[in-house]
Amino acid sequence: MTTATRQEVLGLYRSIFRLARKWQATSGQMEDTIKEKQYILNEARTLFRKNKNLTDTDLIKQCIDECTARIEIGLHYKIPYPRPIHLPPMGLTPLRGRGLRSQEKLRKLSKPVYLRSHDEVS
């Protein structure tokens, strides 16, 4: 990891913690705010620790893009959780043969940048 990339990643990590410190739930209730702040902190720690040993610059760039997208989406929609995605048309084909391969391809292509680190939910 280059020095510039390292500084960018550390800056994102710090900005997430600053965001969590100032976060207010849209419901206005204190317990919701505390839960959402804790979710932000836990999610950041988990994903940064998961990706700390990456050496490929393209993968690092994808993770940085995902992080900035999740920050921007969270600030815009005022929710810390990833936005749900919907299956693409023809996404529920039979689970065998070519249908399965095309279904997996459609799901992979339709997955937005901000959900790259999340596992496939069945």
Curated annotation (Swiss-Prot):
CDD domains: Complex1_LYR_LYRM1
UniProt keyword terms in alphabetical order: Nucleus
Annotated InterPro entries: Complex1_LYR_dom (IPR008011), Complex1_LYR_LYRM1 (IPR045294), LYRM1 (IPR040330)
Entry keyword annotation includes DNA repair: no
Annotated compartments: Nucleus
Summary of the tissues where the protein is detected: High levels in adipose tissue.
Main location: nucleus
GO cellular component: midbody; mitochondrion; nucleoplasm
Key word Magnesium present: no
One Pfam entry name: Complex1_LYR
Top-level lineage group: Eukaryota
Family to which this protein belongs: Belongs to the complex I LYR family.
PANTHER family, sorted: LYR MOTIF-CONTAINING PROTEIN 1 (PTHR14273:SF0)
Stated role: May promote cell proliferation and inhibition of apoptosis of preadipocytes.
Illness: When overexpressed, may be involved in obesity-associated insulin resistance, possibly by causing mitochondrial dysfunction in adipocytes.
Protein name as annotated: LYR motif-containing protein 1
Gene name of the encoded protein: LYRM1
